[in-house]
C-alpha cells in the first residue's frame, strides 16, 4: 500500500522513480480507507534527504500511511529552504491536540553535546512526554533513542573516543517477538554516532528488552515492555551513499575521520560502498508499522485508551534454540 504525502513534496519524484508506491493527498481523499497516521519529527540537517529515506521505508509496507512532518522550531535551516519548511512542516502547537498511530523521531548531529545543553532539549522532552499519551507507538532513531532512554528511564550514555561509523553485524537475542519476524539470526545495520548505551544497563532495566545487539556496535534494538517505544540505535533508513557523504564531509572539515567499517568494498574508501542493510531496514519498519502500530492502535484515534497490548507471551519469550 502507498504512503500518502503532501502534494508536490520533492521526495515524491525520487520515490516514484524507484518504484516506491506514493499517493498524493488529492488522490487519497477519494479512497475510503483508514490509513495509519504517522508523524515524523525530523531533526536531521538535510530535511529532504531524511524525508526521502523514511518515506522510502514507509512506502514499502503493506499499509496505507498518512504522514505529517513536524519541525522542532521555526528557525532557518542551513540545508533546507524556509519555503520547504513552511510548506510541508508543522509546528508542535498545530498537532498537540491530535493523536497519531505512530511517531518517528530521527537522529540528530548532536552526539557530543550533553542533552541539557541542546538548545531545543525542553522541546524534545515535551514531545516525548506528549507522545506517551497521544501516540500508539514511537520509533526513536539513533540520537533520539539515546535522548529518550535518558529522559524516560534515566539511563546515561557513554561518549566514545571516536565516531562509530560503519555497517556492523548484529544478532537477534530473542526470536518470539513480532518485531523480529522474518529476521535472519544475523543481519547488518549502519551506525554513525559518538556515543552508546551500555548493553548491561539496558538489560538490567525492568521496563526494557534488548532484542538485537552487535559485538562491535553494542545494543541495536531495544523495546519497552509495554511495546509502545522502540529504540533503534543505528540508521536502518540510510541510503547507500549516506555514510560516504558523511565521511567525505568530515574529511573536508579536517576532522580526520576513521573510514566507515565494513562499508566500502575492501574497506577502501576509493572503492564503491556496498549496501547490505536495505532488506533488514525495510523489514524492521514494516514489522514495526504492522505489529506495533496497526495491530495495537484503536480504530478511533480519539480514544487512546483502546490500545490493545500484545499478549504476555510476546513480552518475555526467550530464544532458547
Swiss-Prot record:
E.C. number(s) listed in UniProt: 2.3.1.46
Record-annotated site: Important for acyl-CoA specificity: 111
Pathway involvement of the protein, from the record: Amino-acid biosynthesis; L-methionine biosynthesis via de novo pathway; O-succinyl-L-homoserine from L-homoserine: step 1/1
Residues holding substrate: 163, 192, 249
Gene Ontology, cellular component aspect: cytoplasm
Gene3D superfamilies for the chain: 3.40.50.880
Active-site residues, as the UniProt record annotates them: 142 (acyl-thioester intermediate), 235 (proton acceptor), 237
Record GO biological process: L-methionine biosynthetic process from homoserine via O-succinyl-L-homoserine and cystathionine
Catalytic activity field: L-homoserine + succinyl-CoA = O-succinyl-L-homoserine + CoA
InterPro entries (UniProt xref): Class_I_gatase-like (IPR029062), HST_MetA (IPR005697), MetA_family (IPR033752)
Subcellular location per the Swiss-Prot or TrEMBL entry: Cytoplasm
GO MF, one annotated term: homoserine O-succinyltransferase activity
SUPFAM superfamilies in the record: Class I glutamine amidotransferase-like
Annotated family: Belongs to the MetA family.
Biological function: Transfers a succinyl group from succinyl-CoA to L-homoserine, forming succinyl-L-homoserine.
Full protein name: Homoserine O-succinyltransferase
High-level lineage: Bacteria, Pseudomonadati, Pseudomonadota, Gammaproteobacteria, Alteromonadales
